[in-house]
Amino acid sequence: WVSSCWPILVYMFMSSKKLPHLKPLGIIALPSAVFCIIEPIMFGLPVVMNGFLLIPFILTHCITGALTYWLTSIGFVGKMYLNLPWATPSPLLGYLAAGGSIGGAVVVFINFAIGMVIFYPFWKAYEKSEVQKMEAEAVEA
């Protein structure tokens, strides 16, 4: 989830001046996101019914999953052999599940960076759309 959830959280905080209604959601979602509980973002933003965010959410998982598989197959990351609780924070999960391989934690940060790059144009389009909605509502009022 680090490749698709954390970029959304980062962009939510970065956009808090243009879209002030996202900051409280980000503050509420942050503690649970540390432990891989992303429902506040999935249904609060919402990602689920939002074409701007659903497309990169799915795309990011496909790309980072394939990359992680490839990095494991070439030996950069040790094979995952520990079954840890799903709520373990992501960098720690990567490190421990790979048997203490630092490569496991490094891959988590690589996946996060890839998620940031993939989400950027989609987030900008979402942000622009939301700003236009807010301006239209202000004109009506």
List PLM regions with ranges.
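Transmembrane alpha-helical segments and their short flanking loops
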Residues: 42-141
